[in-house]
Amino acid sequence: GDQVVLLYRAHADDIVSHIGLATSNDGFHFEREEEPILSPEHDYERYGCEDPRVTCIDGTYYLTYTGWDRTTARLCLATSTDLHTWTKHGPVLTGDFAEFDTFAATRTPHGRAWSKAGVIVPQKMQGRWWMYFGEGSIYWATSEDLLHWTPGTGQDDPMYTPTPGSFDEDLVEIGTSPVLTDSGLLVMLTNGARRVGGTEGGFEVDYRCGQIAIDPAHPDRVLARLQEPWLVPQTFEDTHGLVANVTFVEGLVKFGGMWLAYYGQSDTTLAVAVADASGEPTWGRSADGRPGTVLKADG
């Protein structure tokens, strides 16, 4: 298309999140709509609709988002044909699969157990639709109709877990929907975190961005991971905000001969990183390689 459409989380002083929509003709300068396109309505999301990720399949937009009730961060689903009028389908994992909506101990062999984040792969694999989801560890689920999802494993058997001694040693989380590369592999941007020393004997969490590769012939496993993060907190916006030291990627689009990766900075602002789409990605923070905040997301 001739525009980039960005769905983003924003909140006012009450820190109750809504999802807004903004458009851009160049991928860097955005005009946002005055009213949110998705707001809390139900008990499971009464304190926020967060972390939007959208996939378009056969003219329908499938939006996964986090419903937050200040106890549990649930993976939820909504659909639309015009990006403005949405039908909410509620939490994705319920009933027998509600184990993914519990908040397990922070430090377990497999991290935390919120369903939270999710991305839908825009093409079928092995005759089914696939979703990757999870915060703490990454899991997979399949569907016949894109609305009803069945996890492929239990909470104790994730497909991807934190790597000891690495930038994601305490937490891994879904980033962007996978893209199919010329080599036939799916590449997905991810988020990782580790604890670092804080003040007065406490600790802080440092979020960085990674990548994993998945073979569509074996979509239930990670084939390879990037050993070093491609994006780390560096700028003032990355290191100062509602939650400090966070670069957190959620959107990826190919536009104008570039890959544009949209990421959050310390839960306060949004920015974009770019890579040349004609070759191997070498990420920079804006078209000229300099830091660039493109949209305030604080209400």
Sequence positions of predicted segments:
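Beta-rich carbohydrate-recognition and catalytic domains
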Residues: 1-47, 56-170, 179-242, 256-299
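ATP/pyrophosphate-binding catalytic subdomain of soluble kinases
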Residues: 173
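Low-complexity, glycine/alanine/valine/leucine- and proline-rich hydrophobic stretches
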Residues: 244-247
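Electrostatic interaction modules used in gene-expression and signaling proteins
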Residues: 252-254
